[in-house]
Amino acid sequence: MNEALINDLRLAGYEVNTNGIGLTQIEGNGFILEYEFSQWWLYANYGELIEYVDQFDSLDAALGAANLMKCLKLIHPLCFKIGLQIL
């Protein structure tokens, strides 16, 4: 990931870091994205509980799903998985 993209993500309000095992990690409100095996892995972040949701080929698709997940959580905390299965 290049420095310009990292800066753009940070300007958009995301936290971009490298985790303890060296994977690129992007955190937003209620989600975590990690890049591993040429895939972006989306996790729901409930504070103390982190749950796998899905994986994506592109960062744009992963961020889109993360934002959809965030919107669906506002409607009802349990329905975001139903929405992601439709994708």
From Swiss-Prot:
* Highest taxon in the source lineage: Viruses
Question: Which Pfam family is one of this chain's hits?
Answer: DUF5495
**InterPro entries in UniProt:** DUF5495
Please report the name of this protein according to its UniProt entry: Uncharacterized 9.8 kDa protein in Gp55-nrdG intergenic region
